Amino acid sequence: MQIDPADALRLDVLHALGTSATGASFATSSGDVLDVQCYGAGAFRLRVGPAARADYGIVAARPQAATTTQSARGAWAIAAGDARLDIASGPLAFRLLWKDRLVLCSATDHDRTGAPRLPALGRVRQGGLWSAAFALATGEPVYGLGEKFGALDKRGQLLQSRVEDAQDVNTSRSGTNTPFAWSVGTTQGAWGVYVHTPADVTHAIGHPDWSHRSYALVVEDDALDLFVFAGDQPASILDLYTQITGRPAPVPRWSLGLALVRARDEAPDASAVAATRFRERRISADVVALAGDAFGDFAASIVEGANAAEAPAWLAKLRERAFRLCLRETAEVDVDSPLFHELASQQYLLATDEGEPYICARAEGDEAQATWREFALVDFTHADAFAWWRDAHASVFEAGIDVVSVEARTEVPDDVAAWNGDAGSRLSNAYALLHTRCGFEATARYRTPGGGAPAIFATAGWTGSQRTPLAIGPFAQADWEGLAATLRGALSSGMSGVACYAATVGTDLGERAPPELFVRWLQAAVFLSHLRLAGGGDRDPWLYGADAEGIARKWLTFRYRLIPYLEQAITEATRTGMPVARAMALAFPESRLVRDFETQFMCGDALLVAPILREGGEIDVALPPGAWYDLNTRARYAGSQVLRYAAKLDQFPVFGREGYALPLGRGVQHTGEIASDLPLEALWVFGKPVRPLEGFRQARVESDRIAGFTVRALLNVDVQVFGDASSVTVLPL
């Protein structure tokens, strides 16, 4: 999209209409009212335009107290805590300050006459488009915007926030989108911008076609609704953003185990046989994601009322081997299904302007034997349709399914008419949010008792989807660039408030990965919050050769040992919004050295992971400030340096952070073998502790308020100290 500033009405503030305990409102030159509200120290909301239509419950917070003042020059200031938003007129300009330091302001790009080239706020005369623009300093990076597979630093990119079937990881198309961006700033503090809308948003982040010195955005909605954030560091911005849009929910322990994604054309009994082989070969796994037609067409299974009494033998076989079962679903209802006529008669389907069910069509199958399929989409904006679809899951859960995987294979057409009055152009992104929300509520209501917290797997999402974990990435091309892009998608999602993200090891796209690539992909995914393994055909671990199978077994065993640690990281996410896998710019924003190493990441607070992205096992590792212990050799390395690292195929570059501790469980075949109250087997302590460790009955690191921190552990916990053991006090618990 190109933007011509001449097409926009440049908004200016004429005068204040009034103030309140939480903000102020202003008359503008376009006749619209600009409403500014505080949502806590460091969070301000700016709304202008007609009364908003359906917002789909995205904002989960309320305005908070602020102080509003006017200077002698007529500028207004709204302040709360250490943050202040200044609003000036002639022309309209914003300044966001943190601790009296400027962190963000409206665009400073001027034309030859001295007039702003990009308005702070603008409205296209024909309506339906709004713009906003913010200044960028030279070298100022910008991150976020959801699941994007290119560079994490979005500076110089032109991107769209729009939910699409990504299909692969080679373009900017993605399923999980969030119109939320942030920057580490320029030593003054961090800032963030969130566009509150279900509509498409185009972002030009220092893009030269718009302005290399500005972050400009265009919103395809009837009103403009922005949040701006200020804080000390990016973690503070994520905290504010997830306060506003919702914290991630907890996940069940079994979801942290390996999920086996079976091929779409694999019969359920064949999936059961393959899963049995995982147990026989002692390769740890917890979930089997069945093909979409495991119970027949998902909608048809609802009509048939599948129940436990009718459960086939293959399902019983999986249950006997302690596997959790995942069923893929879409909200597509075939026109030939009896369910189509039932839902159409109740107006539970997205419709045309004339009120008839909107019929979508798609070719399916191999190109030579493709069949044309016609279907309609459930209208989740209709409260009764939402409840009907949610409750219809009862029979599927009763049949033995533990979780559903919501797959958005169809983009909502722009000319669809929804029950709530929205057209498809405004519903398309929210549809993924609503479908996932419906499936999550169904899981919470009907899942098997004792299965832990509810969860749902989803290939698509919008702002707010982080409340209903978890997101799953698309299949990637089976080469080294596919691995790198997969990691960037996971890390970009984490930088956008998505705390839990499942990357898929391997692919169903074309040829399988070579054994070396398969191993490196698996090793990297072990340290993400969730991981899936593409299987079926020639893609199961034992089919890569005995060496690859043995290494896969080793690292999956370590994955299961990490589960107590991962659970702690997810608990932190539910409180702060920090993802489990943290890109360098998020974890160490003050270190320019590590920022450009965009496929490195922290797994929680204690582990630095440096995935190997090429043949041969060599990688450059940028060690952040501090000191780091190589988990392979236990060697200690000073931080703030780039290390050339070589790893044999059964090794992987992972480093423990000095001053931190790593709680580890036993190696198990599935999470059902983990003792709920006594999960620990070992505690690895990286040098002299400087941080507490809490939450476990078997071990903890606590401050003694005199000499520092003391490690206490039960006798059945193996405490291992990396580095100088004499510097660490270990006492019985």
For each feature predicted by the language model, list its residue ranges.
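N-terminal accessory segment at the very beginning of proteins
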Residues: 1-255, 259-276, 287-290, 304, ...
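Generic recognition of flexible, low-complexity loop/linker segments
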Residues: 23, 33-34, 166-169, 177-179, ...
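Short, well-ordered loop/turn elements at secondary-structure boundaries
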Residues: 30-31, 72-73, 79-81, 90, ...
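Aromatic- and carboxylate-enriched substrate-binding clefts and catalytic-loop regions
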Residues: 51-53, 106, 121, 284-552, ...
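Composition- and surface-driven signal marking solvent-exposed, interaction-prone regions
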Residues: 194-197, 206-208, 271-272, 290, ...
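A non-catalytic, amphipathic alpha-helix used as a structural packing/dimerization or gating element
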Residues: 240, 273, 384, 388-392, ...
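Catalytic core of carbohydrate-active enzymes
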Residues: 440-446, 454-455, 461-472, 493-503, ...
